[in-house]
Amino acid sequence: MNDHPSLFRIYLQLMKLRVVVLLQITAICAILAHDLMVRGDAISGDRTWLETLEACLVTLLGGTLAAGGSNAINMVYDRDIDPGMSRTRARPIPNGWISVRHSLIFGVTISVLGSAVFALYHWKAVFWSMFSVLFYVFIYTIWLKRRTCLLYTSPSPRDLSTSRMPSSA
């Protein structure tokens, strides 16, 4: 029996698609809420339903790639702590299914591609997509995540251990 998943499945795991789906639901709801307010004359604008659909599709593609790429970069950075947690020890890098270099190249590439997709729509969307990727990688992953327990989330209370909290906690 081969427990080693295909490269495609490894890429999907690196992207943390379950988390990305939640982000995308929020994004699509925001687009729809905006356009419904426009149609109700609560705010100004004149986008058609076809343009709304286009905005949703661009957001789904670009947002999934950008967020998925930043998640892959996060896994590269967390490769030293992932083997020690039950929730993360089965990830592709700790299992040796993919190299750190390959994972980083994948993450950076799809982050840039995701942000580039927004160029089809508006330069401001490109800016905010890249800002989000950089914020997640540098501010959350590298700077904040290991410095405070207030950012720690876990699906199970048993995963919350004092070893993950700063000594001042």
Give the role of each language-model region.
Residues 10-12, 93:
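A short amphipathic helical element positioned immediately N-terminal to and/or at the very start
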Residues 33, 41-75, 111, 127, ...:
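Membrane-embedded alpha-helical segments that form the functional core of polytopic membrane enzymes
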Residues 152-157:
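Conserved small/polar residues in nucleotide/adenosyl-binding loops
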Residues 136-148:
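C-terminal ends of transmembrane helices
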Residues 16-32:
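The first (N-terminal) embedded transmembrane alpha-helix
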Residues 33, 120-121, 142-143:
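Helix-loop junctions at the membrane-solvent interface of multi-pass transporters
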Residues 79, 87-127:
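Multi-pass membrane catalytic core of lipid/isoprenoid biosynthesis enzymes
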Residues 1-9:
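Short, Lys/Arg-rich, polar N-terminal cytosolic tail immediately upstream
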